[in-house]
Every structure is written in C-alpha cells, then in structure tokens.
Amino acid sequence: MSVGRIRYDWHTAEIRAVYDMPLLELIYQAASVHRQFHNPKQIQVCKLISIKTGGCPEDCSYCAQSSRYQTEVKPQALLDKQTVVEIAQNAKQKGVSRVCMGAAWREVRDNSQFDRVLEMVKDVTDMGLEVCCTLGMLTTDQAKKLETAGLYAYNHNLDTSSDYYSTIITTRTYSDRLNTIENVRQTNVTVCSGGILGLGESIDDRVAMLQTLATLNPHPESVPINILSQVEGTPLEDQPDVPVWDVVRMIATARIVMPTSDVRLSAGRARLSQVEQAFCFMAGANSIFSSDDNKMLTVTTPCPDYDADQEMLNLLGLEMRPPSQRPQPVVMGNS
C-alpha cells in the first residue's frame, strides 16, 4: 500500500489495514507523510471560547451541555462581544493563532443572537486570528454570512460512524451533519470535522468514520480527534478510558488517509502525559487547545494551560504556528 498521496477513493478495508499496522511502523509511516505535507516543528495552539453554554435540546450521550441530563453545567446566556474580544486578545498574547467560538445550539437561527456572533467573528478576525465557529446545523445562506464576517473555519463533527451514530444521538441524523458540511463547502470557509473516541464504538466504527471523512472531496482542512471525558450525569459517565495507543493509532491513520489536513489533538488531552502527547505529535497531530484559566474545554473537558503547553513545546523542540492565510480547498480527481 502506498502512502503519501492525496486520494478520495479509500475503501474501509484499506483504512483498517493502515490502522492495524504494527504500531511503530504505523507511527513511522504517518510521520513520513506528516513531514511531506507539513512543517513538523510547528503546532497550532487554539483557544476555545464557550460563547453560549448549556441548555442544548439535543440528546448527545456524551455531552454535559444537554438539557436532558443532570450535570454540573450551569446554563449561560450568549456572552457579550467585548468579553469575547478580551479573551481572544489575551489568547493571542500567549501565542494562540486560532480561536474557536462554540455555542450550545441545535442549529443557527436568523435572529439577533446570530447577528451578535457575526460581530464577534468580524472583530476577532480583525485581530489577525483564525476564527472557527461551532454553532450546530446551518444553511448555506448562514454560512455565507459567516464568510462575509471573515470566518476561517466551521466545525461540525461526525462524532462516530454512521452505523453507530444513532446509539449516541437521536435528535439529529448523520445526513444532517453531512448536509451542514456541504452547506459550508458552498463558501470559502474551511471545514473542521472529526470525531470522539470512547463512546463505546468498535474499531470498525472508528475506521468507518475516517473513511467517510477521507472520501469527502476535498478533505476537511481540519480533523479533530477528541477523547471522551466521562461526565457524571450523562449516559456515558461509566465508559472506560480510551487506551493512549488507540489515540495514537487514530491520529496516525487520519494523517495517512488525509495528508493535507490539520489533525487536532483536541478534547481529553489533559489526561495525557507529555510523553504520550509526544507520540501523538510524532504520529501527525499538529494542533492542540490550550487555556489560561483551566476552565473547561467545551465545558466538559479540562484544558491544559498555556504555561504547561509552552514548557512541553520547548522540551520537544516545537514552536507555535502563526495564523494561516485562508487556504484554497484541495479538490482533485481520484488517483
């Protein structure tokens, strides 16, 4: 099997063969692909701001923000623009180059709250930062409004495979998620879409999710790999921890099948040691989320702080990546 070329015709069996490689060989192959398409010394450090917290009507089994579960999350109204701008300014001073604004909504609605989000996007973009939003489902017209405001990326995760999906979520279909990604693709906004490990899914489910992403043309420019943090009060509170080598395998496989994408070591990173994170970077992860206040990433997962991350990057000889110019999606025929 050849690696290191962009293709959109991956079969599930091929991806499973990649995932099942002997671990050190898999890491080596992924590292080789990573060096071919990316600067291996650079890691993008991102900051997530929960601009509207809790009270979500959906039933995602892993999420502390669902109104259906009794968790410690206290609903919080949409933040004011000045607060968001101040958080982003502080993050930029720490070396952050990408800010992700998350709202616990099922879908975007054309109302005054969306208008306020558009203003936030414009002001933070004007600071020279990449801005990503995760606001739920949206239409093409709404995506175009976000594009006009300067949005760099829109996040809409698949979470898991299409077969396992209904076990985790019943209030939104897999097709709904793919349709939102397609709506974003009608603009120049880049796509961020990945999944979560530890939902009770099988290896086949993980591989199937990657196959769905890797057969999108173009590939998502950003592929977050999240690790479940069990939240008391949610249906998945008793799920076992994900073995770190499963995380490394998933990152390496994503890197090989989607060579140009940023693979983001996202939620759940706080429980990984520096050594374990180093293996993730070797396997092709080139982005992390960091914070200055140890508040919750997406309100469910502790986020490492800037100082600890800077120390780790220095130790590993890595540097923070500056903001990117908006890339043009890589669209090619199957090869």
UniProtKB/Swiss-Prot annotation:
Protein residues bound to [2Fe-2S] cluster: C100, C132, C192, R264
Molecular function GO terms recorded: 2 iron, 2 sulfur cluster binding; 4 iron, 4 sulfur cluster binding; biotin synthase activity; iron ion binding
Keywords attached to this entry: 2Fe-2S, 4Fe-4S, Biotin biosynthesis, Iron, Iron-sulfur, Metal-binding, S-adenosyl-L-methionine, Transferase
Listed PANTHER family: BIOTIN SYNTHASE, BIOTIN SYNTHASE, MITOCHONDRIAL
Native source species: Trichormus variabilis (strain ATCC 29413 / PCC 7937)
Reaction catalyzed: (4R,5S)-dethiobiotin + (sulfur carrier)-SH + 2 reduced [2Fe-2S]-[ferredoxin] + 2 S-adenosyl-L-methionine = (sulfur carrier)-H + biotin + 2 5'-deoxyadenosine + 2 L-methionine + 2 oxidized [2Fe-2S]-[ferredoxin]
Residues annotated to bind [4Fe-4S] cluster: C56, C60, C63
Family indicated by similarity: Belongs to the radical SAM superfamily. Biotin synthase family.
The UniProt record lists the keyword Iron-sulfur: yes
EC number, UniProt record: 2.8.1.6
Pathway annotation: Cofactor biosynthesis; biotin biosynthesis; biotin from 7,8-diaminononanoate: step 2/2
Known role: Catalyzes the conversion of dethiobiotin (DTB) to biotin by the insertion of a sulfur atom into dethiobiotin via a radical-based mechanism.
GO BP, one annotated term: biotin biosynthetic process
Name of the coding gene: bioB
Broad class of enzyme this protein falls into: transferase
Subunit structure: Homodimer.
Pfam families, A to Z: BATS, Radical_SAM
Residues annotated as domain Radical SAM core: 41-269
Disulfide bonds: none
Keyword Cell membrane: no
Name of the protein this chain belongs to: Biotin synthase
Gene3D superfamilies cross-referenced by the UniProt entry: Aldolase class I (3.20.20.70)
Cofactor, free-text remark: Binds 1 [4Fe-4S] cluster. The cluster is coordinated with 3 cysteines and an exchangeable S-adenosyl-L-methionine. Binds 1 [2Fe-2S] cluster. The cluster is coordinated with 3 cysteines and 1 arginine.
